Amino acid sequence: MNISYDRYIRTTDDYHIKSVQTIFKKLYDKGYIYKGEYKGKYCTPCESFWTESQLKDGKCPDCGRDVVEAKEEAYFFKMAPFADRIEKLLTETDYLRPKTRAVELVNNFIKPGLEDLCVSRTSFKWGIPVTFDPNHVVYVWIDALSNYITALGYENDQYDDYKKYWPADVHMVAKDIMRFHAIIWPAMLMALEEPLPKHLAVHGWITFNGEKMSKSLGNVVDPLVLGERYGADAIRYHILREMALGSDSSFSNEIMIKRINSDLANGLGNLVSRTVAMVEKYFGGTLPTERESGEFDESLIETAKALRPAVDDYIEKTQLNNALAEIFKVVSRANKYIDETTPWVLAKDESNKTRLATVLYNLLDTIRIISTLLSAFMPTTMPSIWEQIGASKEDVSYENAAKFGVLPLDVTVKKGEVLFPRIDVDKEIEELNALIAKNQPKETAKPKIEGLAQIGIDDFAKVELRAAKILACEPVKKSKKLLKLTLDDGEGERTVASGISQYYKPDELVGKTIVLVANLKPAKLCGVESNGMILAADCGEDDVKVLFLDDSIPAGSRIR
């Protein structure tokens, strides 16, 4: 998909730890962090505090068990001092995109009153210690959210990019983590007296045929498979064209293929192919320098010159789908220009050669503008277009995308391969459906299970099961069976050693969400301290399968 990271970071990196400790102390010294006690109705099995109003018939709203009065020492971050500023930020500025999200944030969180945020824990030892109170470790909020700036060198000597890149022009997040980035993160930055990102853009989810993607349903779309079949640029174009900011978008193989055919093959690809072919056929590949204006020229030229400002405006508003729609309006206009000017008719009369050269030049320069503006969306294909239309690196600079007439008058073209081959829709859908069917869960013979002694619900409640995402995985040098997993458990990172190396390669596990037994006592396995255990199924002789969860389940979610 031509997606890569510039800098891979972990919250266990030394520089990040130093920065977080400095940030925590700075907020404490400013009076925004204070030590207190968390009091409330506590459910022991769920390890959760509840307010009186949250209880259901006086019991835990999650598991229905009895709750007890409990308290725990913790540090808190004051949220109330920032409530008014954050409400104005969300409702009176264009910080949040789409702005329609502001209503739910204000009504659900700010109007009821922002509660102070618990930012330390004493119930576990792993994490970043609070320098002035080592019994406490920094809880997830300050640790995780601050990595956006610590990775740039804020309060550390590792990097020197903070002044260069911060504040970010756009901070883009998914809708399920909107609250943290629209309320908590701005409050932290305000307390630190650091600038906020200029905009927070919240995108929706991609569904499949209107249904949530799920491995259990077998309808998860593999972008690598699609990229191999149609090219990364085609997939990037389809997804960005279909997704409107703030809304979920439904992915459909049929819609994708039809869009590739209509927009890319019949639209852009056909425009480039026809134009280059006519220059080669009628002028041997190089246009003469004489020009003769005629009907329809001004309309095309003005449309092409107006394209970059329109695209700039939509990108500034984080409306990438509209930016692409605007570009392809010009693609359609250029194809219509061919039909209006009928170059094949002009070519029949030698006296029309100058007019014909003008028509083809106008088309080539329009293609130059179109392809320059598409290069951020479709970076692999555009250089091929530039080579075909004879454009230099300077010709396709972003600055020149606002100008018409940049290509040399005697430009030379070079016909290349078909940019986007047409796809047989029915045949392709049949093959893709077969792939989906292949991925459907298969029924297997049930293994004989020897049961253990029954236990009570209270015994089971002692086990804390939690969703965790695998951040990194590597073999353990001293063992043939163990893999060392670095997990995000929703509160921080921890290391777990698991005897699954003969069943999984490390790169098959990275990014997966698994079930973690989170409250096992630490154990040392072949020199690795393991803080927990992941769940796997014994499917028979030499067959073990890790229990993977749906990727939409956030790390840290309790499993009951």
PLM regions and their residue ranges:
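N-terminal catalytic cores of NTP/NDP-binding nucleotidyl/phosphoryl-transfer enzymes
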Residues: I9-F24, D29, C46, C63, ...
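Intrinsic disorder at enzyme termini
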Residues: I385-D459
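Phosphate-backbone binding interfaces of nucleic-acid-interacting proteins
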Residues: P441-R560
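Helix-rich, typically C-terminal accessory recognition domains appended to large enzymatic cores
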Residues: K35, E242, S247, I255-S293, ...
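Beta-strand segments within the central parallel beta-sheet cores of soluble alpha/beta enzyme folds
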Residues: H199-V202, W386-Q388, K484
